[in-house]
């Protein structure tokens, strides 16, 4: 599966870390240079939409703070439901979710896009609906508008979390403690 990683040009440190993670997993991932904008949220939104617009095959999209917490990536991916549109390999789960099969739960009420796979169908569907200048940050748009509409799944155990680091998006050190939220996958 093709892989893309979103990275700001001035954050070579984050690209170096992410690329090392990909090498350890045996993944070939291309760096996508983030679109610069004075508003960091708009930069993030524009960049996510630009990535979706170039998806022509099933594609893994990572953020540059991704941290793999399991070496079972290919094993878990191979058990994904056949009808998937979007796969989350970790996330901030806000409510209990329904188990579907093997390592996969129906994904609703979940934030974060640090490790997500998209089909071309899902990418097209999102780009037709998402306004990067609108009121939502991309993660929130997916949670509210896309997860209820498409076949979105999240795995347990999580394969990826977000590494604690300074976030250019939030202008502060960010530590999301995502592993704790996987307990909502009953």
Which residues does each PLM region occupy?
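An acidic/histidine-cluster motif and surrounding catalytic segment
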Residues: 1-62, 66-186
């Amino acid at each position: 599966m093709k892989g893309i990683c979103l990275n700001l040009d001035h954050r070579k440190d984050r690209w170096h870390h992410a690329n090392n993670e990909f090498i350890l997993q045996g993944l070939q991932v291309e760096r996508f240079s983030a679109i610069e904008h004075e508003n960091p949220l708009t930069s993030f939104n524009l960049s996510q939409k630009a990535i979706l617009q170039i998806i022509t095959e099933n594609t893994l999209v990572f953020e540059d703070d991704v941290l793999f917490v399991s070496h079972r990536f290919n094993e878990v991916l191979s058990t994904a439901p056949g009808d998937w549109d979007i796969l989350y390999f970790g996330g901030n789960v806000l409510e209990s979710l329904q188990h579907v099969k093997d390592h996969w739960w129906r994904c609703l009420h979940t934030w974060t896009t640090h490790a997500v796979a998209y089909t071309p169908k899902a990418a097209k569907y999102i780009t037709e609906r998402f306004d990067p200048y609108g009121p939502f940050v991309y993660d929130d748009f997916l949670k509210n508008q896309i997860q209820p509409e498409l076949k979105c799944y999240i795995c347990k155990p999580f394969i990826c979390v977000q590494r604690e680091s300074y976030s250019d998006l939030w202008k502060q050190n960010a530590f999301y403690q995502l592993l704790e939220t996987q307990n909502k996958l009953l």
